[in-house]
Every structure is written in structure tokens, then in C-alpha cells.
Amino acid sequence: MVWWDDPDDAFCEDPFDPEGDYGALQVGKQPMNRYVICYDIVDDKRRLKVAKCLDSYGSRVQFSVFEVLVSKPLMTRMVRELGALINAKTDRISIYPQCATCDARRTDLGATVEKPVHEPWIIV
């Protein structure tokens, strides 16, 4: 079992959070956490597919770096989709959780990109 699938794993634990909610944003009933995802994909076609997949979950902040704001179930789905797109022998995707405390202390220099904020969808 991996960390994003473990039901007993606290989601984005932050030991400095006195409230104990670990700084997760709440959208509806789902806690949302931010991740920085970077990749090194050898093949151009696979790289484009990975970029399109990540673009559907978040915002590109560099050529091979995305920020996503997702719930735990969406994180699981995204990781499975990405895993199916890459060649594990030659490609690499790194996913870095970013707690709310760390995100609040973030510094951007130069041209910046808006932090992704996903509003809940209401389908009628």
C-alpha cells in the first residue's frame, strides 16, 4: 500500500498545526491538499500525455512542474492515471506534498502563476 491509498494515513500531516486538521483546505466535505509535481519524461508523446493529465488537475508553473490542489480520492486517481502513462524504466514523476503552513511561507520570484484553486462542481 502506498501513502495516498492508506486509509489510516493522516492527510498532509503538519506537526505545527495546533488545530490538528493539518492545514488541509476544506472544499465541501473533502479536505484538499496541494502538491508540487515534477517530471522527467524521455518520450515526447508520453511527456505530452503526462502534461495534459496534470493540466486537468492543476496549473503548470514551469515546463515540467505542476501544482495541484486535490482531495485524497482525486490524488489516488491522478497517481494511477500518471502511472499508466509512463515507462517506469526511463521516466520519472516526483510528487511533493505541500502543507498549508509551508504553502503560506512560499516565495515566488519573477513571473508567477496563480495558485490553483478548484471550486466544487455542482451538476444539476
From Swiss-Prot:
GO terms assigned for molecular function:
metal ion binding; RNA endonuclease activity
In the Enzyme Commission scheme, what number(s) does this protein have? 3.1.-.-
Q: Which Pfam family is an annotated match for this chain, by its short name?
A: CRISPR_Cas2
* Domain of life of the source: Bacteria
Q: Does the keyword Metal-binding apply?
A: yes
Return the broad EC class. Answer: hydrolase
Co-factor(s): Mg(2+)
- Kindly list the cysteine pairs connected by disulfide bridges: none
Residues the record lists as binding Mg(2+)? D40
What are the recorded Gene Ontology BP terms?
Answer: defense response to virus; maintenance of CRISPR repeat elements
| The keyword GTP-binding appears for this protein | no
Q: Which UniProt keywords apply?
A: Antiviral defense, Endonuclease, Hydrolase, Magnesium, Metal-binding, Nuclease
InterPro entries listed in its UniProt record = CRISPR_associated_Cas2 (IPR021127), Virulence_VapD/CRISPR_Cas2 (IPR019199)
Its assembly, as annotated, is: Homodimer, forms a heterotetramer with a Cas1 homodimer.
Described by its record, this protein's role is as follows: CRISPR (clustered regularly interspaced short palindromic repeat), is an adaptive immune system that provides protection against mobile genetic elements (viruses, transposable elements and conjugative plasmids). CRISPR clusters contain sequences complementary to antecedent mobile elements and target invading nucleic acids. CRISPR clusters are transcribed and processed into CRISPR RNA (crRNA). Functions as a ssRNA-specific endoribonuclease. Involved in the integration of spacer DNA into the CRISPR cassette.
> To which protein family does this belong?
Belongs to the CRISPR-associated endoribonuclease Cas2 protein family.
**The name this protein goes by in its record:** CRISPR-associated endoribonuclease Cas2 4
- The gene is cas2-4
